[in-house]
C-alpha cells in the first residue's frame, strides 16, 4: 500500500482496452438499479463529440454555464470539485491525462479540478433535479477509514452486514479529515504541489 493511489489507478487504466470506463469507488454500495439506457445514450454523445471527457453522475454545487443533453450541467471551469471521484462515465484517455501519479484521492479531486481549467475538454455533471444514474449514499460508505455517517451504517445493517465498530468508528460531519501525509517535510509538500500543477 506504499504505492500512491493515483499510480495504481493509472496502471489499472493502462490494462483496460475500451475507450470508455465507468468509474466507481469500492465503497459505493448501490441501492437501486443502474440506468443502463442513460449510460448507453451518454456513450453515443461521447462518440459524436470527441471533446467530451466525462459525464459525472452526481450534481455539484454552483450555477451552471449551460444545460446539455436535457439532464446535464456544464459548470464554469473554476467550480470546486469539477473533477471528482463520484460515479462517472469517462473517456479513458482523458481520465489518464488528468491523473498525477503521486496523488491521493483528495489531492486528485482538488488539484485535478485546478489542472482541468487548462483544458477545453467538456465535463458534464448531472442536474440536481435529474434522475440519478447510479443510486448510492452520497460520498460512499467510508470516509477517512471510518464509516461515513450513521445512514451508511444503517444501510449495511439492512443488507445483513455485521459491523465491528472496534475496527472502524463512525465519521461525523465536521470531523477533521486525514487528507495529508503528515510526515512529509515542507520542501516535499511544495514539490508535490508543483508536480500536481504541471
Protein language model regions, located:
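Membrane-proximal basic amphipathic "stem/tether" segments
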Residues: 157-198
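A structural signal for short, well-ordered beta-strand segments and their strand-loop junctions
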Residues: 22-23, 53-58, 89, 123-127
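Conserved donor-nucleotide/metal-binding helix-loop-beta segment in metal-dependent transferases, i.e.
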Residues: 33-59
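Short, flexible, basic/aromatic active-site loop/helix in glycosyltransferases
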Residues: 65-80
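Catalytic core and acceptor-binding pocket of nucleotide-sugar-dependent glycosyltransferases
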Residues: 83-147
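Short beta-strand-to-loop acidic/aromatic patch adjacent to the donor-nucleotide binding site
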Residues: 19-29
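Active-site-proximal specificity loops/subdomain of glycosyltransferases
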Residues: 1-18
Amino acid at each position: 500500500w506504499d504505492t500512491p493511489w493515483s499510480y495504481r489507478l493509472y496502471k489499472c487504466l493502462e490494462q483496460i482496452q475500451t475507450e470508455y470506463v465507468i468509474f466507481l469507488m469500492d465503497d459505493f454500495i448501490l441501492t437501486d438499479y443502474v440506468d443502463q439506457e442513460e449510460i448507453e445514450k451518454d456513450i453515443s454523445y461521447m462518440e459524436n463529440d470527441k471533446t467530451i471527457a466525462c459525464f459525472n453522475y452526481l450534481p455539484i454545487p454552483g450555477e451552471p454555464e449551460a444545460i446539455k443533453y436535457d439532464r446535464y450541467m456544464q459548470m464554469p471551469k473554476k467550480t470546486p470539485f469539477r473533477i471528482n471521484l463520484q460515479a462517472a462515465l469517462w473517456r479513458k484517455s482523458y481520465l489518464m491525462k488528468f491523473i498525477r501519479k503521486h496523488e491521493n484521492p483528495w489531492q486528485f479531486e482538488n488539484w485535478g479540478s485546478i489542472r482541468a481549467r487548462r483544458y477545453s475538454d467538456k465535463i458534464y455533471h448531472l442536474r440536481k433535479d435529474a434522475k440519478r444514474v447510479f443510486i448510492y449514499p452520497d460520498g460512499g460508505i467510508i470516509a477517512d477509514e471510518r464509516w461515513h455517517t450513521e445512514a451508511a451504517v444503517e444501510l449495511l445493517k439492512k443488507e445483513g452486514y455485521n459491523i465491528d465498530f472496534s475496527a472502524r468508528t463512525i465519521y461525523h460531519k465536521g470531523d477533521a479529515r486525514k487528507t495529508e501525509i503528515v510526515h512529509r517535510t515542507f520542501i516535499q509538500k511544495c514539490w508535490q504541489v508543483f508536480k500536481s500543477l504541471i
